Curated annotation (Swiss-Prot):
Catalyzes the cyclization of GTP to (8S)-3',8-cyclo-7,8-dihydroguanosine 5'-triphosphate. Pathway: Cofactor biosynthesis; molybdopterin biosynthesis. [4Fe-4S] cluster 1 binds at C24, C28, C31. Its cofactor is [4Fe-4S] cluster. The keyword Ligase does not apply. GO terms for molecular function: 4 iron, 4 sulfur cluster binding; cyclic pyranopterin monophosphate synthase activity; GTP 3',8'-cyclase activity; GTP binding; metal ion binding; S-adenosyl-L-methionine binding. The gene is moaA. One of its GO terms (biological process) is Mo-molybdopterin cofactor biosynthetic process. [4Fe-4S] cluster 2 binds at C257, C260, C274. The lineage of its organism: Bacteria, Pseudomonadati, Pseudomonadota, Gammaproteobacteria, Enterobacterales. InterPro entries: Aldolase_TIM (IPR013785), Elp3/MiaA/NifB-like_rSAM (IPR006638), MoaA (IPR013483), MoaA_NifB_PqqE_Fe-S-bd_CS (IPR000385), MoaA_twitch (IPR010505), MoCo_biosynth_MoaA/MoaC (IPR050105), rSAM (IPR007197). Its EC number is 4.1.99.22. It comes from Salmonella paratyphi B (strain ATCC BAA-1250 / SPB7). This is GTP 3',8-cyclase.
Length: 329
């Protein structure tokens, strides 16, 4: 096995976010308000199952323990179950998760679990069906809620729910969310609205710091939990009276990048060192044959030397990320 992926700032990388499509059938106001518009995909299309098998094998050899499949909406891939199984061929990868809008979860949760999926994140920005429709452009609230129930029925012990925190939209609904997770083992993760190239106006209108919620949680007796090395960026809080947990993802907080442990590969095979970085390193030419694995590992390791210490969101520099479906959020 090659050495553990480590950058110039001694950060170790155990977590790969792998986008498998940039297509999405929802029109969320903060991501794709005008719906999906083709244009970012080359003639080669999205990564094939074999290419996904090779890239995850290389990352596993370099110390990756967790792979999250993202999009777009990953379940729009007809071969999604095969993709899960391909990633699971790597014994070193202990966790395989998906971030989904949940519209196919009720139908497919059991088959995904059987294929090897170990974790599910579902995007739910409101518990009010009408507001959910307004945010997502889809009248699918009850279908998504049924999907979360189906995930538990399929054997997932915990479901993570992602909620983008937006001023005057849902920031005042903490009590409603807390009542929902009190009897349920759901980790509800409030994610600060992030500025993207296409979303500057929305950001200025609706951004609110997660610190407001953190202060309120601490006041109510919620306790900050220790972070594991392959965990995502959320600060997680628990409370003895609740089956669920609260996570806060606050990319504008000081030192947010100090604990970065994740890298990204786009749906067309580009390595991105940061969600809000520039450019990207193409890996695709080294995903065509198993014999290329050593060269692939070398290219990944070499690219990591260029990873910056921090993003530049505070300067409104969003890099190449025009919207969050482009690389995989």
């Amino acid at each position: 096995m090659a050495s553990q992926l480590t950058d110039a700032f001694a950060r170790k990388f155990y977590y790969l976010r792998l986008s498998i499509t940039d297509v999405c059938n929802f029109r969320c106001t903060y991501c794709l308000p005008d719906g999906y518009k083709p244009g970012g995909v080359t003639n080669n299309g999205f990564l094939t199952v074999d290419e996904i098998r090779r890239v995850t094998r290389a990352f596993a050899s370099l110390g990756t323990e967790k792979v999250r499949l993202t999009g777009g909406e990953p379940s729009l891939r007809r071969d999604f179950t095969d993709i899960i199984a391909a990633v699971g061929e790597n014994d070193a990868i202990r966790q395989i998760a998906v971030t989904t809008n949940g519209y196919r979860l009720a139908r497919d949760a059991a088959s995904w679990r059987e294929a090897g999926l170990t974790g599910v994140n579902v995007s739910v920005d409101s518990l009010d069906a009408r507001q959910f429709h307004a945010i997502t452009g889809q009248d699918k609230f009850r279908q998504v809620m049924a999907g979360i129930d189906a995930a538990f029925d399929a054997g997932f012990e915990k479901v993570k729910v992602n909620t983008v925190l937006m001023r005057d939209v849902n920031h005042h609904q903490l009590d409603t969310f807390l009542a929902w997770i009190q009897p349920r083992p759901i980790q509800l993760r409030f994610i600060e609205l992030m500025e993207t190239g296409e979303g500057s106006d929305l950001f200025r209108k609706h951004h609110i710091s997660g610190q407001v919620l953190r202060d309120e949680l601490i006041k109510r007796g919620w306790i900050h939990q220790l972070r594991q090395r392959s965990d995502g960026p959320a600060q997680v809080f628990c409370h003895p009276d609740y089956a669920g947990e609260i996570g806060l993802i606050m990319p504008y907080e000081k030192d947010f990048c100090a604990t970065c442990n994740r890298l990204r590969v786009s749906s067309v095979g580009k390595l991105h060192l940061c969600l809000f970085g520039d450019g990207g390193v193409s890996l695709r030419d080294l995903l065509q044959d198993d014999a290329q694995q050593y060269a692939l590992e070398e290219r990944i390791s070499d690219a990591l030397r260029e990873k910056k210490q921090t993003h530049f969101l505070h300067q409104s520099n969003t890099g190449i990320t025009q919207n969050l479906s482009y690389i995989g959020g």
